């Protein structure tokens, strides 16, 4: 069986085709081999979407899955289901992603946020394999959080927007915050643009600055501790450009344990 996948991002669209092997007979054990992949810059929708559709045309895919930057409408009964909604990327507001590819390709289209797609991948094949509840956090240009809870992706009033979790400030932080909606949310204080604006240099040029990463770990750990208390995940996966600073992992883990104060303890 041949399937298609799209990682729809604010700067690039990654489109891929995969072959699904089902020899083992168990749905959770299916393996997908990527046979073709292309990266398309995210320009205006009228330029980008036809290029994406053209990649899949004539390839014989039976279905397509889209993990998309947001916010997006995930309510199937909504007239705007499958749309990108109030994104800061003005040209992409109210763009019908599901409808566009359904019409172009004539196959079923699955649709969710990019981070929910990522956490689904982690529980299916990756670091959170076989977990009933897991969280995926990407820390880069923004902060996104995907939640897989009791065997299903979490939806509700909207999809999880836990990247905008409100935080207490680090006692030495005088930076106002990057988020235009919430001065002291996780994205506003810990995203890549926030790090650069606070310290005057991009994160990749600050690797040797202990004070930078102590403050970053403070904010990430504060959020992670709250996610542990709220969602009770068996695994939390951290990724994104900021997490290329590998020293952060141990710093965040130590700070999370400190914040939880022994109330919840798990060696993993």
Where in this protein do the model-derived segments appear?
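General beta-strand structural signal in soluble alpha/beta enzymes
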Residues: 109-113
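Active-site glycine-centered loops adjacent to acidic/histidine catalytic or metal-binding residues
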Residues: 7, 114, 140
């Amino acid at each position: 069986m041949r399937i298609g996948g799209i990682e729809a991002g604010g700067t690039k669209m990654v489109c891929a085709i995969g072959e699904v092997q089902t020899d083992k007979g168990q749905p959770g054990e299916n393996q997908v081999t990527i046979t073709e992949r292309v990266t398309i810059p995210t320009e205006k929708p009228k330029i980008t979407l036809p290029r994406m559709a053209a990649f899949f045309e004539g390839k014989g895919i039976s279905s397509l899955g889209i993990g998309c930057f947001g916010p997006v409408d995930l309510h199937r009964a909504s007239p705007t289901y499958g749309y990108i909604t109030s994104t800061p990327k003005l040209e992409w507001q109210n763009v019908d992603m599901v409808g566009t590819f359904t019409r172009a390709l004539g196959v079923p289209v699955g649709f969710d946020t990019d981070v929910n797609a990522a956490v689904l991948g982690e529980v299916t094949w990756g670091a959170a394999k076989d977990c009933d509840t897991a969280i995926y956090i990407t820390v880069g240009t923004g902060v996104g959080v995907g939640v897989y809870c009791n065997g299903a992706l979490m939806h509700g009033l909207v999809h999880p927007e836990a990247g905008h979790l409100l935080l207490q400030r680090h006692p030495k932080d005088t930076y106002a915050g990057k988020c235009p909606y919430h001065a002291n949310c996780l994205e506003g204080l810990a995203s890549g643009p926030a790090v650069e604006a606070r310290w005057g240099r991009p994160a990749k040029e600050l690797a040797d600055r202990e004070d930078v990463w102590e403050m970053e770990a403070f904010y990430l750990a504060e959020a992670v501790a709250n996610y542990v208390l709220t969602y009770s995940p068996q695994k939390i996966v951290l990724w994104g450009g900021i997490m290329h600073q590998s020293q952060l992992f141990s710093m965040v883990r130590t700070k999370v344990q400190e914040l939880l104060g022994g109330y919840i303890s798990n060696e993993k």
